[in-house]
Amino acid sequence: MLDIVIMAAGKGTRMKSSRPKVLHTLAGRALLQHVLATAAGLGAQRLITITGHGAEQVEAAMRSAFPAAPLAFVRQEPQLGTGHAVQQAVPLLDDAGTTLILNGDTPLIEASTARALVDACDGTRLALLTIDLADPTGYGRILRDGDGRGEKLLGIVEHKDASAEQRAVREVYTGMMAAPTALLKRWLACLSNDNAQREYYLTDVVAMAVADGVAVVAAQPASETEVLGVNSPLQLADLERRLQRKQAEALLEAGVRLADPARFDLRGTLGCGSDVEIDVNCVFEGRVELGDGVRIGAHCVIRDARIAAGAVIHPFTHIDGAEVGAGALVGPFARLRPGAELGAEVHIGNFVEVKNSTLARGAKANHLAYLGDATVGERVNYGAGSITANYDGANKHRTVIGDDVHVGSNCVLVAPVTLGAGATIGGGSTISKDVPAGQLGVARARQTVIAGWQRPQKKR
């Protein structure tokens, strides 16, 4: 049986933020959420997160993100070191299994690496995740009985307690380990805080394992990025770019054309058909699906959307919770809000906003317009400056526009109202009553021309 313990109690002072460190986001998800997502795929019977600073906020966020996962939380109050943190989880650990310990601020650990660490433990050994770093400053150093990696592993010395000779060692402990649970419990009970920091170090269990004759082995990740932690905004920004580059490369390998992979951000999942083109500085959030031949212009923000084959999204368009039909044209500078559903070959032009509305095939609103809570038929032409007045101060109401309706410029459609198929609305009208099919609706003051009128003259 496998129990997973995730360390997430730290304050993150260097983040200089009131937000708990593990709730800072990387590619749109909290750091801890990345770790829990990886852990959830390992088949553990229990995912135990150790919280401390901002515990209630952290626990609520993770319960919301993983409603079906076998989550458990224990609190470390006060924070007296990594060993003290794991001691808080002891009552929840199954003696007959293996305990895997991960870091809540090391978000890019791969499931394959975590699994390799558990396999290295094999229920009998203490397995440490180590890596060689060009600059090991701040990390605990691996001590071996000799200079080579194949030499026996004897222990770990924390950076603050290391001698100059020990600090020259490049192999470091990443903070992650796997151990037989029964042995781990025994070692945790023997921890001492007799060190420079007066803390209980989890790393001290290594020397205890050696003393007990338990083999101590090391596993290593495929890349350094997997074990990089976050302690400052600079480190978070570095990890963001590393992850975004990795995601961009995966899309490029799948055939997506990114104008510049260094200027691309994915904060969720992005599914793409063939021949998809994405220009620079686009941000994709939540779950986005792009059909075959979709083209996305520069500087677009697209969240939780489906865009069908052949659609073109022009630059500076914002799409949130919307569906765009095949061959549709959207933007530039358009906004599709939640509930917007555009049919095939619909045109939504510059500075047009659509919210909670459906537009059937071939409908057009090419500039400076608002459609909210509306049902729009096929081939409708919706003039510049026209809006649906859908809110009466208390409730929202719908506007129904039939097929082949022509709405002139600068019209106000006061909902609830229905325009029958083929109706025409004269420009500048405020329509508050239904217009029958095929009829002309005009509601504006009659034009007056005053003959002989002269402009006022400036006084001398």
Swiss-Prot record:
Disulfide linkage: none
Reaction it catalyzes: alpha-D-glucosamine 1-phosphate + acetyl-CoA = N-acetyl-alpha-D-glucosamine 1-phosphate + CoA + H(+); N-acetyl-alpha-D-glucosamine 1-phosphate + UTP + H(+) = UDP-N-acetyl-alpha-D-glucosamine + diphosphate
Keyword Acyltransferase: yes
EC number(s) recorded for this UniProt protein: 2.7.7.23, 2.3.1.157
Region (N-acetyltransferase): 255-460
Broad class of enzyme this protein falls into: transferase
GO molecular function: glucosamine-1-phosphate N-acetyltransferase activity; magnesium ion binding; UDP-N-acetylglucosamine diphosphorylase activity
Positions of the UniProt region annotated as Pyrophosphorylase: 1-233
InterPro entries with a match to the protein in the record: Bifunctional_GlmU (IPR005882), GlmU-like (IPR050065), GlmU_C_LbH (IPR038009), Hexapep (IPR001451), MobA-like_NTP_Trfase (IPR025877), Nucleotide-diphossugar_trans (IPR029044), Trimer_LpxA-like_sf (IPR011004)
Positions bound to acetyl-CoA: A384, N390, Y391, S409, G427, R444
Family assignment from sequence similarity: In the N-terminal section; belongs to the N-acetylglucosamine-1-phosphate uridyltransferase family. In the C-terminal section; belongs to the transferase hexapeptide repeat family.
Subunit description: Homotrimer.
Stated name of the protein: Bifunctional protein GlmU
Annotated source species: Methylibium petroleiphilum (strain ATCC BAA-1232 / LMG 22953 / PM1)
Gene that this sequence comes from: glmU
